[in-house]
Amino acid sequence: MKEYNKSEIIFVVEMNSKGGITSDMVSEFSKFYTDTIDKNEPNTLGWGFYESGDKIILIERYLNDVAAIQHAKNISEGEILEKQFARFTEHFTFIKIDVFGNASDELKDFVKPFGLPFYFHNSYAMFSRG
């Protein structure tokens, strides 16, 4: 019998690069930040930066709400990825963040203080193999 993860949460983050940030700088930083997440967040299932015309799309896949909240904690002030996230914000501005999956009220409440444009989309049907 197949076992699927029905709790996966996916963030699709639409961003612009900040003025003075070249395509090469985006590429180099994206590799650095992706490696940083891979090394520090075992319950982050996937992470990737993608070119989309003049925008950058970041797709973040989390095992569940707990993993998504842990990531948000990790990038917060005084936490393990605070300095790396500060560099992130030197490169990118957020346009919007679409969150796919059945996000808990806890996750929704946790991200509110970030003051970013979050849009939550519950699933009708889905599966994730991990």
Where are these regions (language model features)?
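A short, acidic, amphipathic alpha-helical segment used as a generic capping/interface helix at domain edges
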Residues: 79-87
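A short gly/proline-enriched turn/hairpin at secondary-structure junctions
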Residues: 59-60, 84
